[in-house]
Amino acid sequence: TKIEWCDSSWSPITGCYHACPYCYARATANRFKGCDIAESGEADTFVVDLKERLKVTNKDGVTRNAAYPFGFTPTFHEYRLDDPKTKGFGKTIFVCSMADMFGSWVPEEWIVKIFDACKAAPGHRYLFLTKNPQRYIDLYNAGILPDGDEFWYGRMPAL
């Protein structure tokens, strides 16, 4: 990653409904999208759950992996859950750099699966950022938010 404060980024969720005008992630995802299924600001409940990687074919017949097959529509890339196990040991990993993992539209089940994947790959430092810090509190109160030294939580300013 080119982000100076982490060694790696890992985005098992991509996409967001905040519609921030300065969002680099939205621009990147839309540049490499496969198709349009939801527009920015559309219903905050529309999400996609992918079990395996998709490929897209462009108008010239070239097929490629689709990192963001649905643009910036919130998408859970479940096939990426084992990625931290491949990153060696002792890395600082920015989790969901291409999404707000704690947005109100993200199903709790997705969050739990990501925390479980982090726990299954110990020895890293996992960094989480959100514009919805209330979700941290809700998950903590529900006994879901991990509190070990390897889990770091922060917030981004809301619009």
Predicted regions: what is each one?
Residues 1-159:
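Conserved Radical SAM active-site core
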